[in-house]
Amino acid sequence: MKLFKTFRNKTHTSRWLFADSYSNDWKNRAIKLMDLFKSHEYIENSKNQVVEYGCGCFAPFYNLYNGKDGFQVSKYDLVAWDKETNVIDLNSNELTLPITNISVFSGVIEYLNDVPSILRKAIQTSDYLLISYAFVPSALFLDEGKFLKTINNRAIANGWRNHYTNKYLVKLFSNIGIISAIDVWNGNQSLFLIRNPKLDKFE
């Protein structure tokens, strides 16, 4: 059993060590996510530190926004794609996250073992979270066969470790922070901008 678990975890991790596992189209998702922040929370001429988790070889937030419009982007991933990439394993039991204005999880939380715990850590070190998630359509609950087939495909083909509906995501994110804005990308991924409640406290 221990050998199987080791193999399984290495298989899911090793996929992201190679550039051909990433799609350059994900930059469009990054643009739409950042537009959520710019449209709802951005203050003109402000300076914002951004941490891009799971940046991949294309690092869309870093390449699109670093050094522009007051954004300074740091990129993090399982592997150091270049000297600017910080290595991090978000599933580590000893996870420590950097303090920043915006933490980005674009195409990332599907692979996390303990989403609530990690996002609670993230909101404690961030003013905002930008999150994308490939959700499970609620309509699938009306057909158990299709539902199970979908979950099986998510688990085996994609290696995803959690399977949430938008209803669950809204509840989860509302317990972590304040949902500032929501959008949809590509018809099957929800985009969330979450604000740290501390920003609403007046001294």
Question: In which residue ranges do the predicted regions lie?
Answer:
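Conserved N-terminal segment of class I S-adenosyl-L-methionine
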Residues: 1-94, 98, 190, 201-203
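Short, well-ordered alpha-helix to beta-strand connector turns
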Residues: 47, 100, 125-127
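Class I (Rossmann-like) S-adenosyl-L-methionine-dependent methyltransferase catalytic domain
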Residues: 45-46, 144-162
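Core SAM-dependent methyltransferase catalytic element
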Residues: 181-203
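A short SAM/SAH-binding and catalytic strip from SAM-dependent methyltransferases
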Residues: 101-114
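Short alpha-helix
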Residues: 155-177
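Conserved beta-strand signature within the Rossmann-like core of class I S-adenosyl-L-methionine
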Residues: 126-138
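A short, conserved alpha-helix within the catalytic core of class I
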Residues: 112-125
